[in-house]
Curated annotation (Swiss-Prot):
Substrate binds at residues 73, 158, 170. It is found in: Cytoplasm. It comes from Natronomonas pharaonis (strain ATCC 35678 / DSM 2160 / CIP 103997 / JCM 8858 / NBRC 14720 / NCIMB 2260 / Gabara). InterPro entries: AceGlu_kinase-like_sf (IPR036393), Asp/Glu/Uridylate_kinase (IPR001048), G5K_ProB (IPR041739), Glu/AcGlu_kinase (IPR001057), Glu_5kinase (IPR011529), Glu_5kinase/COase_Synthase (IPR005715). It comes from the Archaea. PANTHER family: GLUTAMATE 5-KINASE, ISOPENTENYL PHOSPHATE KINASE. This is Glutamate 5-kinase. Pathway: Amino-acid biosynthesis; L-proline biosynthesis; L-glutamate 5-semialdehyde from L-glutamate: step 1/2. ATP binds at residues 33, 190-191. One of its GO terms (cellular component) is cytosol. The keyword Transit peptide does not apply.
């Protein structure tokens, strides 16, 4: 049998994969990150069906008595859909985010109300992550919200974030949040259902990578070598997953359109790409 690209990248020992997958299934505190493409349609309008599916998936975790924090993109995209045109300047992008963020939160509020759940909005900048006192205040607020069974919905505060204080990417924001709140699992939902050896939208021979661990450098090299902007967009997701794995937290990159995707993770199914702690051990 000929060796595939996935084989050449090296594999994670199955015992390590199974242990990390079990830890992911048993995670008590989960950070879920949803990207813009997981929430909007091709015209950048907020897609009600996509948002409701995300909430349905999160509600399943809540019913399993898990704490869930949602890091949600989509504000600028939702703003474009509401206003009717895109941004040409930083100021326009920031203004669109304010329009879109309010619309996004209104829809989240409505959708979670179907499950008699309340939500709270938290907007952050890089300064909030870097300043110990401010980050501690953020974590304390999150703890209180979770004690009240309220779902924190987190996004970057685009309206006030200048280039110097921008986090720049919600993949990195979700990684920082997961570490800061002592999460047991980070799930990044995207419009591609896993990390592949190529862009699955363009390459029919692209293979799903089941797990990433000690083979991270090869995976990172593969992603960075890609010339496709669509596939290249997964780079920060891979980096964010790697970051939390350094703290003993399993991470999964999976498709937002996958049926019952969070339920599959919570029941130990093999879905998406699993990032195990890089020391090859799962967190105790």
């Amino acid at each position: 049998m000929s060796e595939t690209i996935a084989d050449e990248l090296g594999s994670v020992p199955q015992s390590v994969v199974e242990a990390a997958r079990e830890d992911a299934a048993n995670a008590k505190r989960v950070v879920v990150k949803a990207g813009t493409n997981s929430l909007t349609d091709e015209e950048s309008n907020l897609d009600d069906d996509k948002l409701d599916k995300l909430v349905d998936d999160i509600a399943d975790l809540l019913e399993r008595d898990k704490d869930v924090l949602l890091v949600s993109s989509g504000a600028v995209g939702a703003g474009i859909g509401r206003v009717g045109y895109g941004s040409r300047t930083v100021e326009e992008s920031q203004a669109l985010s304010t329009v879109g963020q309010s619309h996004l939160m209104r829809r989240y509020t409505e959708s979670f109300e179907r499950y008699d759940r309340k939500v709270a909005q938290i907007l952050l900048t890089q300064q909030d992550l870097e300043n110990p006192e401010r980050f501690t205040n953020f974590c304390n607020t999150v703890e209180t919200l979770l004690e009240w069974d309220i779902v924190p919905i987190i996004n970057e505060n685009d309206a006030v974030a200048t280039q110097e204080i921008r986090i720049g990417d919600n993949d990195m924001l979700s990684s920082s949040v997961a570490v800061g709140v002592d999460a047991d699992l980070l799930v990044t939902l995207t419009d591609v259902d896993a990390v592949y050896t190529g862009n699955p939208k363009e390459d029919p021979d692209a293979e799903r990578i089941e797990a990433v661990g000690e083979n991270y450098d090869q995976i990172q090299g593969l992603v960075e070598e890609s010339s496709s902007s669509d596939f290249g967009g997964i780079r920060t997701k891979v980096e964010g997953a790697r970051n939390v794995s350094e703290y003993g937290i399993p991470a999964i990159i999976a498709g937002s359109a996958e049926p019952d995707v969070l339920q599959q993770i919570a029941t130990g199914k093999s879905v998406g790409t699993l990032f195990v702690p890089i020391n090859g051990e799962t967190d105790d």
